[in-house]
Each structure stands twice: as C-alpha cells, then as structure tokens.
Amino acid sequence: MSTGNAATRGSAHFGTISLAMVTPFKKDGSIDLDAGVALAGHFVDEGCDSLVLAGTTGESPTTGATEKLDLLRAVRSELGDSVKLIAGSGSYDTAVTVEMSRASQEAGADSLLVVTPYYSRPSQEGIYQHFTTVADAVDIPVCVYDIPSRSVVPVEPETLHRLADHPQIAAVKDAKGDLAAGMELIENTDLAWYSGDDPLNLPWLAAGATGFISVIGHVATRQLKQLRDAFDAGDIATARSIAVQLQPLQKAQARLGGVTFAKAALKLKGKDVGAPRLPIIEPTAAEMDQLAQDLQAAGV
C-alpha cells in the first residue's frame, strides 16, 4: 500500500512540469553548450521545474557520453538548484547504463531516467535485473521509462510492483498508456507517476500522476503550467479546454516525430537550435508550413 500524497510523490527529485529537452547543435553538427544553457534557462523561466537532458528527444542515440555529460554540467553550473535535472542514462547494455548513470550522478543530476532495454527484447526477469543493477550502483533516484513502442517489450505491472520495492527506484515515466494498470500501481506502491505522452497528460493527472514529461512543452510550457494549475485548483473545465487547444501540437509531433517537431517548432518561434543528427532529418518546406499553421491553431 502506498504512503503519502500521490499528487506530490517524487516531486522533490523529478519535479511536476518537466520537458524532454532537445540538444542544440551548431551548424557544423557539434554540440552547442551555450545554446543548451540558454534554452534550459528559457524553459525554467516559462514554468518548468525539471528538465530531462539526454533523453530520446535530446537525441541520446546519436550523442556521445562526453557530450551528454558536458551539457549536464553546463546546465547545472549555470542554473544551480533552480531546476531539477533528470539525466537520461539508459541503453540496451546494462554495464554501459551503470557507467553512464554513475557519471551522470557525479556530473550533478538530481535523478536518472532509464529506458527499458530496447532491441534485445529481454524477459521480465531480465528487465527487473537491469533496473535493480542500475539502481544498486547509484545514490540518486531512478525513473523507469516504460515505452514499448520503442523498446518493443513493456514493463509489466507485476515487474513494476517488484521494482517499487527497491529504495532507489522511485518513479515511472509512462508512454504505454494503460491507465487502469497505472492507477493500481499509483494506489498500491510509492512510485511517482509521470505521463510520457502529451495527449494523456490530463488523464494521467486525474489518475493520480505527479506530473508529466512533455515534448510539446518546447513551445507550450506556459500553457502546460496553466493546465496543471487549473487541475490543482479543481477547475477541470479550464484544464480540459487547454488540453484540447494543444491538440494540434500533439498531432504535429505524431506526424513529424518528437525531435523533428521540437527543433522545427523552436525555429519557428525564433530559437534555432540546429538540425537533428542523422538518421533524424529536418522537415520539408511543406511540413514547416503545416507546422506553422499548427502552432497558430494551438495559440502558441
């Protein structure tokens, strides 16, 4: 049985309004640390209380360990304790994940986002041992990232119940969308729950989630904060209205993919953070025109 208030559980380490931040690149393709620091500060000013660095939207598959850690150190140095920093440290290799998790802790991360091992399709016992091995190696909280659309294998509820018993495994970022299973886990464990899929931000809050880790927030952080504030105040009608208003952004993200959407949307808003690294590509001119219409329709 859980203890404490589910709505605030985990917020001290993972925040409540979070963004899976892009990694800015220069024209030559190298990482742009100055732009990364400036962008992080912008999102904090807009209302984020935590940021995920080196997550999927941060192009973790195509950035090296040194780049990831340099960005983490730079943002921590500039922003201090004004924002919770969640470091994406997961991979399909447990030993590499342990190494990256330890390095991220040393670089100043408040917590870790560890994705389910992808491509290799491990068993539930393998998934359990992967996460507990990582958690045993660090002293900061771990968030399990359950995203079967990318990892193929989901983290089953029974496995999450087992993982919840580990003192360092403190949260779940859910991109699976099983609200019924999630509610049961929120009710009967101490895991903090985060929506990892923007269309389900409001439904997950209603189910007892602590918050959300957004992609559309790259251009809609203020609106997401307004949604959260309205929900906390019991004004569900306003929260729902904001959620509906943001649907054009959700559709654009689904159409373009998270990285392409976020970087292109920022460019349209006057923040050029560089092109994605291959195999992710920039949108076509026609796609940019449609995205501009989507931003206008969403009021951002």
Curated annotation (Swiss-Prot):
One of its GO terms (cellular component) is cytosol. This is 4-hydroxy-tetrahydrodipicolinate synthase. It catalyses: L-aspartate 4-semialdehyde + pyruvate = (2S,4S)-4-hydroxy-2,3,4,5-tetrahydrodipicolinate + H2O + H(+). Keywords: Amino-acid biosynthesis, Cytoplasm, Diaminopimelate biosynthesis, Lyase, Lysine biosynthesis, Schiff base. Homotetramer; dimer of dimers. Gene3D superfamilies: Aldolase class I (3.20.20.70). It comes from the Bacteria. The gene is dapA. Pfam families: DHDPS. Pyruvate binds at residues 57, 213. Belongs to the DapA family. Its EC number is 4.3.3.7. The active site is at residues 145, 173. Pathway: Amino-acid biosynthesis; L-lysine biosynthesis via DAP pathway; (S)-tetrahydrodipicolinate from L-aspartate: step 3/4. InterPro entries: Aldolase_TIM, DapA, DapA-like, Schiff_base-form_aldolases_AS, Schiff_base-form_aldolases_CS. One of its GO terms (molecular function) is 4-hydroxy-tetrahydrodipicolinate synthase activity.
